[in-house]
C-alpha cells in the first residue's frame, strides 16, 4: 500500500502526485506496482497558525467534498491532526504502506516542513516521492539566458507561453485506491471552532471540485472569457472566473483551467475574442511568476523586494489604518472594496490595486499592514500572489508600479465604476446619491456632503497633497533629496 498526502491539492482529478501513485495510471509516472493508494490529510498546527477563518471554512468544505469523492470511489480520506513528520510515518506503519507520495509546495514554510517529513520517512524506512502539480512549470524551470530567475514578468511570459504544457492528469480508478474497509480510523472532520478559529464574518464561497468546475464552465459558456480583457477591470460587471480560492486550495487543477482556456481560444470567432482569452491565460502565468519570485526570494514575505538606498519613511497612523480596514476613508471606491472584503472574503482585482495604492500612497502606511489584513480576511489569500500584488502597488516589488505613478482613487472609481453600481452595492449610505456626486465626493462642500449622505464620512486625507508627499517619501528613500 501507498499513502498520498493531500495539502493544497484537494481533488482527485488532474492531481499529478495522486495519478503518479495510482498503479493503473501511466500518464504521469510511467506505471508501477507499489500497491493501492490511501489518501491522508493532516491538520498541521504550524500551517494553521498562518490561517484565518475564511480560508479554514473554505478548506473544511473542500475536504468534505474530497472525502465524499473518495467514498464514491470506494475508498475514504484519512484525517489526522499533528506534526506531519510524526503523523505520516505512524499512518504508514499502521497500514504497512511502503511509500508516501505528495505534491511540491514552494513557500519557505512548506519546503522546510517537507524536508522534515522526508527525514522522518527515511528514518522509518518508508520510501517517498514528490511531484510538481500546483504550477505548469516549477520554479527555476524558466530562466534568463544567463541562467537567472526572471524578475520581469514580460520576459518570463514570453518563455512561459512557448513551453509545452502537461495535459490534465486522469483520476485514479477505484481499483487504484485502498478499499475503505482496509483503512485505519478516518476520523470526522473538525469544525472551524474546533480548530481554534471563530466563524468567518464573510459568506465564504462553495468549495470542492464540483463547485470549481461549475465556475469554470460558467466562465466559458457565458462568454465572459471572451470579454475578460475588455471588461475585467469593471467590478460591477466582473467577467472573471472567481477561481482564485479553488486554485489556492487545489480543488481544481491548473492544467484543467489552462486546457479549458485553450479550448475557448480555439473556439473563438474573432481576433478580439482570442486576445481576451490570451489575457486570461496571462493571469495564470502571473501566478507562476510570483510563485517563482517567492521561491527564490523567501525574504519578500517580510521585506521589500526592491532595495532603496534609505528606509522608506512609512507613517505609523493607526487611525488611518483602521478607517481603511473599516471602509470609512471617504473615498467611495476604496470603501466599497474594503467592505466587499468583509462581506465576501473576496475583492475584485482592480479594486485590490486601488485599495493597496491608497493605503501605501495616500495614507503612506507600510504595505505589510495591508498584506496582513488581506491575509486575515481573504478566502483566496496566496502568499506569493498577495505579496507580489502588494509590493507591486507599493513600488517595492519586482516589476512594480513606478513610485511616481500614484493612483487617483476618484478617477479610478469614475473610470471603472462610472454609474457607481459597485460602490452603492457595498456602501449603502451612497445609494441615493447621484453617481457624479459620488465620483466628486472629495470636491463637494461639507454642506453638500451632509445633504447627500450625512452618515458617510468626509475624505480622511487630501489626495493631491498626499500624492506629493508619497513622491517625496520615495525620493528620500532613493537618495534623490
Curated annotation (Swiss-Prot):
Its cofactor is FAD; coenzyme F420-(gamma-Glu)n. Residues 1-136 form the Photolyase/cryptochrome alpha/beta domain. Pfam families: DNA_photolyase (PF00875), FAD_binding_7 (PF03441). The record marks 314, 367, 390 as: Electron transfer via tryptophanyl radical. It is an enzyme of class 4 (lyase). Its EC number is 4.1.99.3. Residues 283-290, 349-350 are annotated as: Interaction with DNA. Keywords: Chromophore, DNA damage, DNA repair, DNA-binding, FAD, Flavoprotein, Lyase, Nucleotide-binding. Monomer. Belongs to the DNA photolyase class-1 family. GO terms for molecular function: deoxyribodipyrimidine photo-lyase activity; DNA binding; FAD binding. FAD binds at residues 228, 240-244, 380-382. The keyword Nucleotide-binding applies. PROSITE patterns: DNA_PHOTOLYASES_1_1 (PS00394), DNA_PHOTOLYASES_1_2 (PS00691), PHR_CRY_ALPHA_BETA (PS51645). PANTHER family: CRYPTOCHROME (PTHR11455), CRYPTOCHROME CIRCADIAN CLOCK 5 ISOFORM X1 (PTHR11455:SF9). Involved in repair of UV radiation-induced DNA damage. Catalyzes the light-dependent monomerization (300-600 nm) of cyclobutyl pyrimidine dimers (in cis-syn configuration), which are formed between adjacent bases on the same DNA strand upon exposure to ultraviolet radiation. InterPro entries: Crypto/Photolyase_FAD-like_sf, Crypto/Photolyase_N_sf, Cryptochr/Photolyase_FAD-bd, Cryptochrome/DNA_photolyase_1, DNA_photolyase_1_CS_C, DNA_photolyase_N, Rossmann-like_a/b/a_fold. It comes from Halobacterium salinarum (strain ATCC 700922 / JCM 11081 / NRC-1). Binds 1 FAD per subunit. GO terms for biological process: DNA repair. This is Deoxyribodipyrimidine photo-lyase. DNA binds at residues 232, 412. It catalyses: cyclobutadipyrimidine (in DNA) = 2 pyrimidine residues (in DNA). Disulfide bonds: none annotated.
